[in-house]
UniProtKB/Swiss-Prot annotation:
One of its GO terms (cellular component) is P-body. Changing D153E: Strongly reduces RNA-binding. It comes from Homo sapiens (Human). This is DNA-directed RNA polymerase II subunit RPB7. Keywords: DNA-directed RNA polymerase, Nucleus, RNA-binding, Transcription.
Length: 172
């Protein structure tokens, strides 16, 4: 799910950036350091929307670097168990499907794929399909899945998904 939340970050700036464009440099460095990153607590930082406050810089003794505390608002993506999301299939093999939900990767075990869908290793590309070939899921297809579990690391979030519910599967 997407959230718009207030966050804080500290920017460490080299003395060569001191000058008339100091604040623009701090803003630019904030965008490059936080956008696209993942924190276990808040999820993936998609975009910085506003910068609320750039605090007074604190000079680091013996180094000359300055540390600026920055308060900002950002849009973050944090998946939860039970959430239904759309994903893109990146890999299909006999153990299941590997998908991407934006910046997050998700695995769907073959035991969480409906029993009427069988893996066909002889097709090119490999796919899961029904007996009448009415539904075929292969690489680069868009599917709708339910998140049944997440694993949160320090810098990444990984999910386990399922297609065993109503209205889940291939999005046409």
């Amino acid at each position: 799910m997407f959230y718009h939340i207030s966050l804080e970050h500290e920017i460490l700036l080299h003395p060569r950036y001191f000058g008339p464009n100091l604040l623009n440099t701090v803003k630019q460095k904030l965008f490059t350091e936080v956008e696209g990153t993942c924190t276990g607590k808040y999820g993936f930082v998609i975009a910085v929307t506003t910068i609320d406050n750039i605090g007074a810089g604190v000079i680091q003794p013996g180094r000359g670097f300055v540390l600026y505390p920055v308060k900002y608002k950002a849009i973050v993506f944090r998946p939860f168990k039970g959430e239904v999301v759309d994903a893109v299939v990146t890999q299909v093999n006999k153990v299941g499907l590997f998908t991407e939900i934006g910046p997050m990767s998700c695995f769907i075990s073959r035991h969480s794929i409906p029993s009427e869908m069988e893996f066909d290793p002889n097709s090119n590309p490999p796919c899961y399909k029904t007996m009448d070939e009415d539904i075929v899921i292969q690489q680069d297809d868009e599917i709708r899945l339910k998140i049944v579990g997440t694993r949160v690391d320090k810098n990444d979030i990984f999910a386990i998904g399922s297609l065993m519910d109503d209205y889940l599967g291939l999005v046409s």
